[in-house]
Amino acid sequence: MLFEAHPEIDIHEMSPLALAFAGDAVLELLVRQRLVETSRLQPGRLHSVATHYVSAHAQNQELALIEPMLTEEEQNILRRGKNASKASVAKHATAQEYRASTGFECLLGWLHLMGRDDRIEELFETIWKNYTPEQEVTVRRNTSCNKAGAQQTAPAFCVAAQ
């Protein structure tokens, strides 16, 4: 585990937006680590691909993949995060996407602070295996990257060199 849980902190009393703040960092680290491990892209391209995984739009779709897997307690945390969203929204997101992404980040932050990195990894694996980001770079669902210049970025993803 990268960081240790802090049982002395009552996580259930924390602000959902504070949990989302932590969850945002958790997701960013997971995505960046996985991209570095599974691709040979240049740093600028890594950043471009990573931003598509962590956008509010993407998080809304990622949440749809894992929502059926959530326990009742996790669903309650997710709901708290969705309901805590600020009135303002991100530039490139709808209000619904922004609320969902805040709830998703709240859940990740809560799981992390509870020391449930095993659960985070389980949920992230489902996302990584099943989510295709919509991005400006060409991404094709494909099990092999046999096109000239294409590099594998994740299981079943190829990003064509530009």
Residue ranges of each PLM-predicted region?
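Double-stranded RNA-binding/processing signature
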Residues: M1-Q162
